[in-house]
Regions:
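Structural register within alpha-helical repeat arrays
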Residues: 239-240, 272, 310
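Extended, well-structured beta-strand/loop surface patches
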Residues: 56-129, 135-232, 246, 263
Length: 318
């Protein structure tokens, strides 16, 4: 005889419902009220080519306090070596917020977060794509900028130099205007680089982020996207258009042909005609243009503007 008691169906339904509700409740994140921080959170982002660089940090104010200075002996003795002295609970009146020769979070609250989507050069030194905590060691005449492999730490209190991915040197610059709230900026920016500036009080600390080969980084991502979407004829066409803009017509034709092979459309045939024309292959361009118009009419596409362009091609007006 079965020793288990039968559970009435209605009771079983109730038990299951309560169980599911309890599980859902357990998965709900806790409710919290966001505090107002004296050092407010900020983020700045710059794209170089197709590489995104994002810096997330907190912005402490000066508020008349001494910022950059040598640590007095009493302060220095608390944490010897490079260890951070950035502890407001230990700091005495008149002591600097950022004492020289000690690790600083380059912000407030959590360690400053530096994220980059591709491999880059920092002041000419290689840094892999990834997320890093950014720390500095300030000095009167030279600063060390540190990219550390522990991105989730609070301040620099658990900073471990063994986890450093990169250290670079830079020269601080005195400026005339006072920056009350610490600020990161990207300026100047070029086609393949951006200068990051840490500004606070009357000091600017710059370092450069460079993408070694912008076009190769773009091509690598383009190839990966096309490989992941082999039936999408638009993607290789987009690559073809980019190469055409660079006047690299051989590569442009290679990709537009790939698009046509995937699926022949008025859009990619007309694009090929324009590329051939730009490359100086006028007879091939006109033949392809006629094929594009025929394809467009068959697909009920609007070919009017392109037909006018082709007429100008044939009349020698372009």
């Amino acid at each position: 005889m079965n020793s288990f008691k039968r559970i009435p169906f209605f009771n079983l339904v109730i038990l299951l419902a309560v169980s599911c509700w309890g599980h859902a409740f357990a998965q709900t994140p806790p409710v919290a009220i966001k505090p107002i921080r004296p050092s407010q959170k900020a983020s700045v982002m710059q794209t170089i080519g197709v590489t995104d660089i994002t810096i997330t940090y907190s912005r402490p104010p000066v508020k008349g306090r001494p910022i950059f200075a040598d640590a007095p002996a009493s302060m220095e003795s608390r944490h010897p070596g490079e260890a951070t002295l950035d502890n407001q609970n230990e700091r005495k009146a008149g002591e600097p917020i950022v004492p020289y020769n000690h690790v600083w979070r380059a912000g407030a609250n959590e360690a400053t977060l530096f994220q980059v989507t591709d491999d880059v050069l920092i002041n000419g030194q290689p840094l892999k794509a990834g997320s890093y905590s950014l720390h500095t060691i300030p000095g009167k005449d030279e600063w060390t900028v540190i990219f550390n492999n522990d991105p989730g730490q609070w301040g620099s209190f658990s900073y471990d130099s063994k986890k450093d991915a990169l250290r670079v040197k830079t020269k601080p610059q005195m400026v005339a205007d006072n920056q009350e709230w610490l600020m990161y900026s990207f300026d100047p920016v070029t086609d393949d680089s951006a200068q990051v500036n840490i500004r606070w009080e009357k000091l600017k600390v710059p370092f450069t982020v460079q993408v070694k080969d912008v076009k190769s980084a773009w091509r690598s991502k383009a190839d990966a996207t096309i490989a992941a979407n082999p039936t999408n004829e638009v993607l290789p066409l987009q690559v073809a258009n980019q190469y055409a803009a660079w006047k690299n017509y051989d590569e442009a034709l290679k990709f537009v042909d790939s698009s046509i092979k995937t699926k022949e459309t008025f859009r990619n045939l007309s694009a090929k005609a324009n590329i051939l024309w730009a490359a100086g292959r006028k007879d091939d361009a006109i033949a392809t243009a006629d094929a594009a118009i025929a394809r467009g009419k068959a697909d009920k596409a609007d070919t009017a503007a392109f037909e006018k362009r082709v007429a100008d091609m044939k009349a020698g007006k372009l």
